[in-house]
């Protein structure tokens, strides 16, 4: 049983956080496009970023900021222009964005983190951003998390939010999160934009370690289309407003906090896969019997990212051969004669041998998952046991539909 409970809210559920989201005119659609997360006190900040060699200005800016000072008061997010591949002017725009917000909040620019999402190669519409800063700050509210979550969306169909609460030393500690991501999602860092807030007190180094480990198990295990973005960023702020004793080393309290952080990240990661562009269902790949956990995660990622597996799921075809083929090319050694593959409750292969199974029933299982979009029953569970060791790992993805091609043919990225 989990040591925490789900509560109402999102990034503003922890004490001392406010948020806002407005329409500043950055998007041609007129949808909300400027978001702000704000801590009333200086918060410990941790970050994980894209591994792409082509990076947005905000990524390089925040890397430098966190290396110099692992704390922050505010996160400014613009949606509509990625500000990636924009050269020196893109960098200057990022710097100016931080300075404008700092001036409006009356805090240091060094206390501001930035994130951008949208079309690669397009600079931020700075005139609209300049005009939007004041109303954005004026919109800050303790219940502004929902608006902030909507203002970071691009091709997303739904906002992605969560809030959890636990007890540490007899005092309530809360953690909240929001994320965006629907396309250009592939496990190679944080795979999208995600923001986590917490009111626990924790040391800088430990908070970064916790976030990095949580990312490996969650966001790095998500794939929608095999493309890694130029802008992937994950930030976690912990402001200590719960007034619990500072957590400075691993122990029961640290383990509880890290487990809750991992749960928040996993929820957001699954929400991203569930909302994959054109997706009709979520795929969860559970791999056991691997040489070690890292190997298990690699096999799970490969299966989740296989276009053939994803297409079979969309076609409601219980094609175990595609699952076996993907497992075999994951770069992990195992004896194929030990392979077990299950689709839901249907055993398709055991001891490396294909089995007779209820094919119409298995196909109907896939159809039912597609009809339960955005519900708990929308998950297609694929279980693979390599029969080699005790390693285990999970990855998440989605099916590949005709709509994915249509969306990305029509949408400039």
UniProtKB/Swiss-Prot annotation:
The protein's name: Arginine biosynthesis bifunctional protein ArgJ
CDD domains tied to this protein: OAT
Domain of life of the native organism: Bacteria
Family label: Belongs to the ArgJ family.
Keyword S-adenosyl-L-methionine recorded: no
GO CC annotations on file: cytoplasm
Enzyme Commission number(s) from the entry: 2.3.1.35, 2.3.1.1
Functional summary from the UniProt entry: Catalyzes two activities which are involved in the cyclic version of arginine biosynthesis: the synthesis of N-acetylglutamate from glutamate and acetyl-CoA as the acetyl donor, and of ornithine by transacetylation between N(2)-acetylornithine and glutamate.
Annotated active site: 191 (nucleophile)
Organism: Synechocystis sp. (strain ATCC 27184 / PCC 6803 / Kazusa)
Catalytic activity: N(2)-acetyl-L-ornithine + L-glutamate = N-acetyl-L-glutamate + L-ornithine; L-glutamate + acetyl-CoA = N-acetyl-L-glutamate + CoA + H(+)
BP terms from Gene Ontology: L-arginine biosynthetic process; ornithine biosynthetic process
Subcellular location: Cytoplasm
UniProt keyword annotations, A-Z: Acyltransferase, Amino-acid biosynthesis, Arginine biosynthesis, Autocatalytic cleavage, Cytoplasm, Multifunctional enzyme, Transferase
Cross-referenced InterPro entries: Arg_biosynth_ArgJ, ArgJ-like_dom_sf, ArgJ_beta_C
